[in-house]
Every structure is written in C-alpha cells, then in structure tokens.
Amino acid sequence: NLNALRDWGHARDYVEMMWLMLQQDKPDDYVIATGHQYSVRDFITTAAKHLGITIAWQGEGVDEVGIIDAFDESIIAEKLINEGTDKDFIARTQLSHLKDIAREVALNPRLKPGNVIVRVSPHYFRPTEVETLLGDPSKAHEKLGWQPKVKFAELVQEMMDNDFIEARRECLCKHAGFSVAAYID
C-alpha cells in the first residue's frame, strides 16, 4: 500500500533511547518513535532519487504505478566506482569490471524514462493493514532529553547505500563469471 504512513526511524536512535531509559532511577514507559510520518511512496521516491531516478506516479490504489520520469545514470556510475570501496583494491582488481557494469546500467532498457519500475501487488496487501502508524515521543523528549538524530532521508540513504554495496558485490561476481543466488521478495 503506497499510501500507508509509517513512523520510520533508525535503530541507532532507538537503541540510544533504550539506553537512556535504562539510566533512569525509576522505571517508566516511553514511546520509541520519531513523531514524523512518511508514506511508502515517499520512501520509494527518496530511495530512487538516491540512485538518480526521478519517479512520476500515475493511477490510484492497486492501479498506481511509478514511472521513470528521468534517470541520471552518472549517479549510479559514480556510486559503482567510488563509494564504499578501498581505492587501492579497486585500482588493482575491480575498476575495469565496475566501468563495464556502469556502462551496462546506463544502457539497461528497463531504466529509460517512461518505463514502469514500481507496481502495486495485491499479494502484499494485508487484511488487517493499519493505514497510519505514528508514535508520540514527547515524553522521551521531555524526561530523557532524547531526540532522534537520523532524518528520514538519511535513513533511506543509509539503507540504499548498504543494499547498493551488496548489489555491486553481486554484479562484480557475476561479471567475473561466478554464480550468484537469485533473491525473490
């Protein structure tokens, strides 16, 4: 459900709050949340932007789709070649493979403006789906002085960076002739 609203928060912030709770002289109940909501659509839009993809949304409900409005392939190429990897290691072993992969990504016909890259699947709808989840952390703010540090866009970026490192590793293995397990879901 692309309209589902969630209170997205980072585990690092939540663990800090738990630690602060444990430092209190007297036990008490607190809501661990950011107090801010974003839709699943917001999450997808932010994640795609991190990869240089701008999504235009069309339709409603199960007929809603996300269509590539624009794609700046230089962003993925930059991430492939420069992010999260030891530069000396790249220089010795991976650079030519990564450049080949970056070219393949740029030429991928599925990543062209006008193509659908997000489609709602009724398979994932839950009969008891809660449309909106929002916590009120005001007591934690007041009594513990706790504030979440990681903003929504940073959370999405961190998740995308981690997934991108894994995907890059798989691409390098495939490009070098190794078999890679297929993942579904």
Regions found by a protein language model. Give the residues of each.
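C-terminal substrate-binding subdomain of Rossmann-fold SDR/epimerase-dehydratase oxidoreductases
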Residues: 1-185
